[in-house]
């Protein structure tokens, strides 16, 4: 189980409250699919994702990005039990979708980049980023739980 300091809890919840999930989710998933094109194979049902422009304009990509942010919200609300909160999601991604668990880490990086760009260094300072990265590492670990 992860130990959170009061400062980390506060940083994560405060940052989460400033994130526009309808904006950051689609941006992060779009970035993932463009920067790491091999991840596109999991989204073949989304229609045309053959070019960067197609990915940027694809509403199914945007919709799934918002869905993923809903999953992150679940983690924020369950900081003390993220692993169990993600059990079914981990099973789905490992047993049904067969997502390479390293893709979760790549998406977490994309989230951090998008949040940092959007909120800037005064909000997303080193202390906040440290707590956020720890949070995302726990989420990534929980999503990969069924792979071990």
Swiss-Prot record:
Database matches in Pfam families: Globin (PF00042)
Tissue distribution of the protein: Red blood cells.
Domain of life assignment: Eukaryota
SUPFAM superfamilies assigned to the protein according to its UniProt record, in alphabetical order: Globin-like
InterPro entries, per the entry: Globin (IPR000971), Globin-like_sf (IPR009050), Globin/Proto (IPR012292), Hemoglobin_b (IPR002337), Hemoglobin_oxygen_transport (IPR050056)
Domain Globin: 3-148
GO aspect biological process, one term: hydrogen peroxide catabolic process
GO cellular component terms given for this protein: blood microparticle; haptoglobin-hemoglobin complex; hemoglobin complex
Gene Ontology molecular function terms on file: haptoglobin binding; heme binding; metal ion binding; organic acid binding; oxygen binding; oxygen carrier activity; peroxidase activity
Binding-site residues, heme b: 64, 93
Gene3D superfamilies, per database record: Globins
Keyword field: Heme, Iron, Metal-binding, Oxygen transport, Transport
Protein purpose: Involved in oxygen transport from gills to the various peripheral tissues.
Assembly mode: Heterotetramer of two alpha chains and two beta chains.
Family: Belongs to the globin family.
Descriptive protein name: Hemoglobin subunit beta
Species, as recorded: Pagrus major (Red sea bream)
Gene name in the database record: hbb
